[in-house]
UniProtKB/Swiss-Prot annotation:
Subcellular location: Nucleus
This protein's UniProt keywords: Nucleus, Phosphoprotein
Keyword Phosphoprotein belongs to the record: yes
Ranges of Low complexity composition bias in the record: 28-37
UniProt-annotated stretches for the region Disordered: 1-39
Name of the protein in its database record: Nuclear protein AMMECR1
Signal peptide per UniProt: none
Length: 344
């Protein structure tokens, strides 16, 4: 199932808990269940493909990306026209009981000072053991997203299959714009997708079909930041406080005042960026999921909560161009840089 990662544009919660909340709501170090095995269901089975979420747990517009041959980023000889994925605005929220709410800032993640110093941001890395697996997310994934968007906006054939791993992951693609890094689009999926097709699809879906924003244009390219988030370590927990701000993303399921099942999610960086504690985050997520009744502690205890982690990489457009200068061959073909006068 797909989701959104973000929340309110330029909106901050007060330091006090939202209306209807209890106190400050610190994290609980242990579950309210009788045993660890009861509280954590371990790896979750991921839902079927196709449903897209916008980071808030709200349904996004549909649409996929185009297919394609090789695509240099300027009009070289032999580069065919056409190509690209879907356009148009997003559709309203629909089945699955997920509502779309005003967007919240998704986190910018780790920006790269130079392509050679590219590092990924992972909330789980600080607590990983020395033998933990190598990070999967890479700067090349963000470059591929920029390639896909550029080729779509200029009508070139889509880039060939990239060289990075094609393992399946739940994923999100987030776009921000300008010096203040305003949210410009954020859509992803909780269904594990092969990275080559998943990033190609959600690059265009998040850029063109996030129903909170108009489709992106060529003029916006130079001011964009692209983030790729790969979601990992899904765990069911019994206690709605059993997660760590800034480390875990959370996905909640609840029954609203009309008896309908609803879901909503925030990526790991959202609560930390907004300065929220556990209670504020849960209450905000309930509102984003469409819950309108007063929020009591008794109701919070009925929430089914899944926590997860993510690996995240962020690249600015300028860093993307610099990366391409140092990597002249991308996806197995020559990859000239786009003319700078396109963006002056």
């Amino acid at each position: 199932m797909a989701a959104g990662c973000c929340g309110v544009k330029k909106q901050k919660l007060s330091s006090s808990p939202p209306s209807g909340s209890g106190g400050g709501g610190g994290a609980s170090s242990s579950s309210h269940c009788s045993g660890e095995s009861q509280c954590r269901a371990g790896e979750l089975g991921l839902g079927g493909a196709g449903t897209r979420l916008n980071g808030l747990g709200g349904l996004s517009g549909g649409g996929g990306s185009g297919g394609g041959g090789g695509c240099p980023l300027s009009p070289p000889q032999g580069c065919g026209g056409g190509g690209g994925g879907g356009g148009g605005g997003g559709s309203g929220s629909g089945g699955g009981g997920i509502s779309l709410s005003p967007p919240l800032s998704c986190g910018v993640g780790t920006l790269l000072s130079t392509p050679a110093a590219a590092t990924a941001s992972s909330p789980s890395s600080s607590s990983s053991s020395p033998g933990s697996r190598k990070m999967v997310v890479s700067a090349e994934m963000c470059c591929f997203c920029f390639d896909v968007l550029y080729c779509h906006l200029y009508g070139y054939q889509q880039p060939r299959t990239p060289r990075f791993t094609n393992e399946p992951y739940p994923l999100f693609v987030t776009w921000k714009i300008g010096r203040d890094k305003r949210l410009r689009g954020c859509i992803g999926t909780f269904s594990a997708m092969n990275l080559h097709s998943g990033l190609r699809e959600y690059t265009l879906t998040s850029a063109l079909k996030d129903s909170r924003f108009p489709p992106m244009t060529r003029d916006e390219l130079p001011r964009l930041f692209c983030s790729v988030s790969l979601l990992t370590n899904f765990e069911d927990v019994c206690d709605y406080l059993d997660w760590e701000v800034g480390v875990h993303g959370i996905r909640i399921e609840f029954i609203n005042e009309k008896g309908s099942k609803r879901t909503a999610t925030y990526l790991p960086e959202v609560a930390k960026e907004q300065g929220w504690d556990h209670i504020q985050t849960i209450d905000s997520l309930l509102r984003k999921g469409g819950y309108k009744a007063p929020i009591t502690n008794e109701f919070r205890k009925t929430i089914k909560l899944t926590r997860y982690r993510s690996e995240k990489m962020t690249l600015s457009y300028a860093e993307y161009l610099a990366h391409r200068q140092h990597h002249h061959f991308q996806n197995g073909i020559g990859h000239p840089l786009p003319p700078y006068n396109h963006y002056s």
